[in-house]
Structure formats: C-alpha cells, structure tokens
C-alpha cells in the first residue's frame, strides 16, 4: 500500500501547477493611472494580464489614441487573460476607470507573439509590481498557470483567509479552505501552492482506503485491489488535483468509517472500555473535521449512528438472558453514551466553531464587527438558504440516478490549441471502475438482504451491512435534493460502492464460482482505461481527433459537450 501511495503521490504532483507565478500586486482606485514605456515604437497586438482580487474596469491607451478595455470580475483573478489590441505606440497609459483594479503582472506582445520590453515611466512606487516579475509570464495561458473551475471560489478564499480579507466563498464551512491555505503559506499564492494540499490528501486516501478494505475483507490482495482501483479512478484523480473542498470531506468520511469499523469489530462486552473508546473517539473527531469541511459530512454521520446503534442493539440482545451480563451491558452503554456526547457532539461543535477563526479575524478589523457566536449562527442560516433556494441550472448538471453510470461529466477546463490540438479536464468516474462496481454493489445488496444463505461468515455479513449503510447514508439524501446536482456529488459514495463490489467478488471467489484471476483482469481493464482517459483527466494537450474518439467512441459519457 505504501509503494502504491508513494508512486501515486509522485505521479499526481507532476504537472500539478506552476511555482512560477507573479505575487506582487498593483492596486488602483478609479482615476489612478500608470504610464508604461516600451522603449521604442511597436505594434502592440495583444495584452496579457494576471489579476488579483478586485472588481472594476480600466483602459489601456496608446499614444496613437487607440485603446483596449479591461474588465476585472470575480472569475478573472489569479489567471492569465489575453486580449487583442491594435496600437502603434511607444508609451501606454493604464488607467482605472471604475471600481478597483488589482493586477499581479502585465505583458505586451506583437503580432508575431514576441514579448515586448516594458518599464514603468510614471506612476506610484507600487506600480512597479506590474512589470517586476517578467519571468513568470508563461509561453501560453493554461490550467498550469491559473485558476480553473471552482478554484475561483475556494482557492481565492484561502488567500482571503491568509490576508484577513472579506471572505468571498461562505457556502461551505471553512476548514477545507483553511487546509488549502496551508499550501499557500508554504509555497505562495501559486497554482502548485493552492493545489498541493488537496493532492496530498488524495494520495493519503490510498493507505486509509487500503486499511479499511483490509479490515472488511481480511485479505491483503483484495485490499490492494481496492486501493489500486481508487488510484486508477479518473474522478479521484481530477477531484484531488483541484483546489476545492470535496477531497477533504471524502478523506474524513473514509476515516470515520474506518474507525467505526474498528469499533464494531471489537467485542463490546469483553474489551476494556478504554480500548473501545480509542477508535470511537477517533471516529468522532473525524466526523467533526468532516462536517467542518462540508455539510455532507452530516449524511455520513447518520450512517455512523446507524452502525453504532445496530452494534449496541446486537450486543444487548446477546446478553438479555444473563442478569450479570445485562447489568454490565448497561454500565458500558451509559459510559459509552456519555463518551459519545463528548466526541460526537461537543468536540465536533468546537471544531466547527474554531474553523470560523478566519471570519472572526476579519470581523475584528471592522468598527462594528459581528460577535463570534452570532457570526457562526448567521453563516449557518445563510448557507442553508443558499443551498435550499438555489435555482440556477448548469450545462453539466445531472440527476442522482445518472451518477453511477457516468453519463455526464463535470467539465472543469477547456482550451483550444489551434485547429488540431486541445487541452481539457473533465471530472467523471471511470466506467471500468464505476459501472462494474455499481453492478457488484447491487448484487451484494441482493445477497446480503434477501438470500441470507449460510455460506457467508458472520464477518462477511457484517462487512456487507457496514458498506450498504455507508452507501445509503452518503447517496440516498441526494435523492431529496431539489437543486441542480453534479456527478461529483457521488464522489463521497463511490469508494463504498467499489468496496461493496469487491466484497461480492470475494464471496464469489471463495465459493468457487469465479476464478481468482477475475480481480486482476478487472484491475488491468481499469488501468488501461485510465491510460486512455489520462489526457482528458489531466489537461495534457491531445490531438483534437483523439478528443473526438474519447467523446464519441469510448463509453465514458459527455466529456467536452460538443466542443471538439
């Protein structure tokens, strides 16, 4: 498992994002201007800008009277934008015309694509930031050197947390953005910096998943199969290489289920309470961290409660005819309930409250800032109404019943590289993993719930119930959500679907109904599919013809939505 984790970590960090990115900032209010000298008269055909956090507009004006308008909005920060110009000039004046404009760097190009020399001719001391990092100007704008998809919310907010600014993204609890911020602290506000922590959490999932699978299957080969299938899933790859919070909630959910499984597999009546409380306490802390990252942790929490109470009831039934055992059961139960009140209620509430420290710090800078408890309550109300009242639609939205069969990807990024090449990132599950797992999970449910044969061990049945509860808890609530939803909302469910399919495969293999080679054939097909899909999952430039093959021939659903 560790070799797989190390190999995956190295692989996922490759081409994650650049460390060469402008960090000094020029900020101007309406009316402020700076004059730029190109050193000689040139024909300026293109202007590149890298924006910071601001909303406003500006105009580039050449000495020949020609202009190029620039508008800065929330979706245009921390990425390179190109705009055409038609200037024959030596001097260019950049003036903020409305609102506020904030730029990290600018560059000028002629029609042949040559970057033109430029220096500040007149302006404030701060205006030097516009041209002081020329080595950070890339050969071409791409996901490697700028934000894409929801990074404009989550990575931006990580920057705001770090600099005690007004917080833009408040529709999810803060912990995930705080974790993204740690990468920014270590590597700067650069694409690698805001993506590295999600990528490392994605790699760290593999040993957690391996350990959970080993607890459930009691076989290292099947545990390795589970971890390898997770590593080879295209959605896992894309979701853990982008600076959003989904990777964190899945990581903490896996920890929750792992620790609850450890607890359930211990003898409730024989093990010392201190030993029982170790995995139970770790589960509660993981639950708190999960909910502080995303509210969907509450769905998983409902599953934990179902597992916990089923285990307690089973233990109570086993000792109902023995007076002494029954007395001991209630002693343990009351102690456990008290422990759970601390670790599943008080500590998660404290973690959740403390995750709002960045909000508290910003409020403290205001003359009439909101108090901490009032602020947290206010944020919860705002979050609820945002998700409950959301009526927006999206090209990539899909219904919950479509997710297991990957019919509609979530299109993160696309750039046309001339007539023959494109670069794209589509977040979608691998049919080689998801389709097979969905069928296997259904067969497991039938076997566990309806057939009830005596061939399976008590441990196998227990593992089946754990997985079916985990699937139901993380998936079924989405059937009641009226707002538009996306395939990546299945991200917290599909690992348990994979485990359920492997558990059914174990049953078939150990009963002699299928060969032991089947699992390796499955893994080989998943690996081959990952190789085929890698360009569309990673942004690696590919021939347009190959993109058309992926879109129209390979059974992977909509990837590019007709763009190729």
Regions found by a protein language model. Name each.
Residues 1, 10-36, 128, 142, ...:
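Transmembrane helical bundles and short interhelical boundary loops of multi-pass, membrane-embedded
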Residues 113-158, 329, 348-406, 544-547, ...:
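Aromatic-rich transmembrane-lumenal/periplasmic boundary elements in polytopic membrane proteins
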Residues 152-162, 166-189, 200, 358, ...:
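Short hydrophobic/aromatic helix or loop-helix immediately within or flanking a transmembrane segment
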Residues 192, 196-217, 255-259:
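Transmembrane-helix motifs of polytopic, lipid-linked glycan transferases
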Residues 194, 198, 235-248, 293-296:
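Short acidic/glycine- and proline-prone juxtamembrane loop motifs at membrane-interface regions
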Residues 204, 209-232, 250-251, 269-275:
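Transmembrane-helix signature of polytopic, membrane-embedded enzymes
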Residues 208, 248-273, 285-287, 305, ...:
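Specific aromatic-rich, kink-prone transmembrane helix
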Residues 226-231, 238, 258, 287, ...:
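Short helix- or helix-capping micro-motifs
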């Amino acid at each position: 498992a560790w070799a797989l984790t190390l190999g995956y970590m190295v692989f996922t960090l490759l081409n994650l994002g650049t460390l060469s990115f402008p960090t000094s900032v020029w900020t101007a209010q309406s009316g402020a201007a700076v004059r730029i000298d190109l050193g000689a008269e040139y024909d300026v055909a293109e202007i590149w800008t890298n924006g910071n956090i601001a909303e406003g507009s500006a105009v580039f004006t050449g000495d020949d009277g020609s202009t190029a308008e620039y508008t800065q909005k929330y979706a245009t920060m921390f990425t390179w934008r190109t705009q055409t110009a038609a200037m024959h000039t030596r001097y260019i004046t950049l003036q903020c015309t409305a609102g506020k404009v904030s730029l990290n760097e600018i560059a000028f190009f002629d029609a042949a694509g040559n970057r033109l020399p430029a220096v500040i001719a007149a302006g404030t001391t701060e205006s030097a930031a516009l041209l002081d990092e020329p080595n950070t100007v890339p050969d071409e704008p791409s996901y490697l050197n700028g934000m894409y998809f929801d990074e404009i919310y989550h990575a931006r907010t990580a920057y705001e947390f770090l600099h005690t600014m007004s917080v833009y993204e408040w529709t999810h609890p803060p912990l995930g953005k705080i974790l993204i911020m740690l990468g920014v602290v270590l590597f700067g506000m650069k694409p690698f910096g805001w993506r590295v922590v999600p990528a490392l959490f994605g790699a760290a999932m593999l040993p957690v998943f391996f350990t959970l699978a080993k607890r459930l299957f009691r076989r290292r080969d099947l545990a390795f199969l589970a971890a390898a299938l997770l590593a080879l899933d295209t959605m896992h790859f894309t979701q853990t290489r982008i600076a959003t919070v989904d990777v964190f909630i899945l990581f903490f959910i896996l920890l929750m289920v792992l620790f609850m499984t450890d607890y359930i597999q211990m003898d409730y009546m024989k093990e010392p309470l201190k030993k029982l409380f170790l995995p139970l306490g770790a589960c509660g802390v993981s639950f708190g961290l999960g909910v502080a990252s995303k509210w969907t942790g509450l769905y998983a929490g409902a599953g934990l409660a179902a597992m916990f109470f089923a285990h307690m009831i089973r233990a109570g039934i086993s000792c109902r005819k023995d007076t002494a055992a029954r007395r001991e059961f209630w002693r343990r139960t009351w102690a456990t309930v008290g422990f759970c009140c601390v670790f599943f209620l008080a500590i998660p509430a404290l973690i959740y409250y403390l995750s709002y420290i960045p909000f508290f710090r910003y409020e403290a800078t205001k003359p009439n800032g909101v108090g901490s408890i009032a602020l947290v309550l206010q944020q919860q109300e705002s979050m609820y109404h945002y998700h409950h009242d959301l009526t927006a639609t999206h090209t990539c939205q899909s219904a919950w019943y479509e997710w297991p069969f990957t019919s509609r990807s979530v299109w993160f990024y696309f750039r046309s590289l001339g007539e023959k090449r494109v670069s794209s990132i589509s977040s979608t599950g691998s049919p080689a993993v998801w389709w097979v797992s969905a069928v296997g999970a259904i067969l497991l449910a039938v076997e566990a719930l309806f057939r009830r044969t005596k061939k399976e061990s008590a441990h196998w049945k227990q593992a089946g119930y754990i997985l079916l509860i985990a699937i139901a808890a993380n998936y079924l609530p989405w059937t009641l959500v009226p707002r538009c939803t996306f395939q990546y909302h299945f991200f917290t469910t599909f690992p348990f679907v994979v485990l359920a399919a492997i558990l059914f495969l174990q049953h078939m293999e150990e009963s002699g109904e299928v060969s032991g080679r089947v699992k390796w054939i499955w893994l080989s097909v998943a690996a081959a599919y990952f190789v085929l899909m890698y360009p569309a999952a990673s942004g690696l430039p590919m021939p347009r013809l190959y993109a058309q093959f992926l879109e129209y021939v390979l059974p992977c659903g909509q990837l590019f939505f007709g763009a190729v």
